[in-house]
């Protein structure tokens, strides 16, 4: 952990993290590549699709936890592939059982298979139920500022608006909505979905997002481990740029050297 990270931590549900890059564990060619990419990213939180990745459900298959130990990483189970609140809640309960009472969970309830946009009605319903059951909910949602605030108000510990559709690689498509969400939030805002390359991650962080979560942008790259390293640097650079404060955009030039005392 570098000195800057230690002085500017990310806090989720009372836990302090030095890394602001959260990574997924799907789509890699094997568990060894998953491990190497996660290490290169410097992630401390890794998200796992309970319905797709084995963390103990099948004793006859390779177990992700053998390469990404819960002693080293915060395992963030997610409800990817769920299309109803009931399925999502059931999946979270299974994850809590598999992870010995682990309360932190990433909720996503999808609306359709083409866009993978969240079903906001089902998302709200599931979030309310999970909070009532004492889960610590990090929630994937649209970039609607009203909905984001509502999810915060019902007790979600982090709100995760999409930058663009899952896996699209389009980057931040509506920075003004994201800015509105960020400015009104009292919980961490984490861009989730749509990042394609390092500049996308930097832009999200420059806007003031607290962190970025990605999977496809790393796992789908020609060299996933190298891309993970690039994303780590982009997130760090974007955060520093946000804190430093960019100069205002101007229509005309402004000389960087003084005009007083010119020779001749």
From Swiss-Prot:
Catalyzed chemical reaction(s): [ThiS sulfur-carrier protein]-C-terminal-Gly-aminoethanethioate + 2-iminoacetate + 1-deoxy-D-xylulose 5-phosphate = [ThiS sulfur-carrier protein]-C-terminal Gly-Gly + 2-[(2R,5Z)-2-carboxy-4-methylthiazol-5(2H)-ylidene]ethyl phosphate + 2 H2O + H(+)
Pathway involvement of the protein, from the record: Cofactor biosynthesis; thiamine diphosphate biosynthesis
UniProt cross-references to Pfam families, sorted A to Z: ThiG
CDD domains: ThiG
GO BP annotation list: thiamine diphosphate biosynthetic process
Keyword terms, alphabetized: Cytoplasm, Schiff base, Thiamine biosynthesis, Transferase
Residues binding 1-deoxy-D-xylulose 5-phosphate, per UniProt: 167, 193-194, 215-216
Enzyme class: transferase
Annotated Gene Ontology cellular component terms: cytoplasm
EC number: 2.8.1.10
Subcellular location: Cytoplasm
Catalytic residues as annotated in Swiss-Prot or TrEMBL: 106 (schiff-base intermediate with dxp)
Primary location recorded for the protein, binned into one broad class: cytoplasm
GO molecular function, one term: thiazole synthase activity
Family: Belongs to the ThiG family.
Quaternary assembly: Homotetramer. Forms heterodimers with either ThiH or ThiS.
Biological role stated in the UniProt entry: Catalyzes the rearrangement of 1-deoxy-D-xylulose 5-phosphate (DXP) to produce the thiazole phosphate moiety of thiamine. Sulfur is provided by the thiocarboxylate moiety of the carrier protein ThiS. In vitro, sulfur can be provided by H(2)S.
Name of the protein: Thiazole synthase
This protein's encoding gene: thiG
């Amino acid at each position: 952990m570098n000195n800057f990270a230690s002085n500017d931590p990310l806090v989720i549900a009372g836990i302090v993290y030095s890394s602001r890059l959260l990574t997924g564990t799907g789509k890699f060619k094997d568990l060894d590549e998953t491990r190497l990419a996660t290490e290169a990213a410097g992630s401390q939180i890794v998200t796992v699709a309970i319905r797709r990745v084995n963390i103990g459900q099948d004793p006859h298959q390779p177990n992700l936890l053998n390469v990404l130990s819960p002693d080293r990483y915060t395992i963030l189970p997610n409800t990817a592939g769920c299309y109803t609140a009931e399925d999502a809640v059931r999946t979270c309960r299974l994850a809590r059982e598999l992870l010995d009472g682990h309360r932190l969970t990433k909720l996503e309830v999808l609306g359709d298979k083409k866009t993978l946009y969240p079903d906001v009605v089902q998302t709200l319903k599931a979030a309310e139920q999970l909070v009532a059951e004492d889960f610590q909910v990090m929630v994937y949602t649209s970039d609607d500022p009203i909905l984001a605030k509502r999810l915060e108000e019902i007790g979600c510990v982090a709100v995760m608006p999409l930058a663009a559709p899952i896996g699209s690689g389009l980057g931040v498509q509506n920075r003004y909505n994201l800015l509105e969400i960020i400015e009104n939030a009292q919980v961490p805002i984490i861009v989730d979905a749509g990042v394609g390359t390092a500049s996308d991650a930097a832009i999200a962080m420059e806007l003031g997002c607290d962190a970025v979560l990605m999977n496809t942008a790393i796992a789908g790259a020609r060299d996933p481990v190298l891309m993970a390293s690039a994303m780590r640097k982009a997130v760090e650079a974007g955060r520093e740029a946000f804190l430093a404060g960019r100069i205002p955009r101007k229509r005309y030039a402004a000389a960087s050297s003084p005009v007083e005392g010119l020779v001749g």
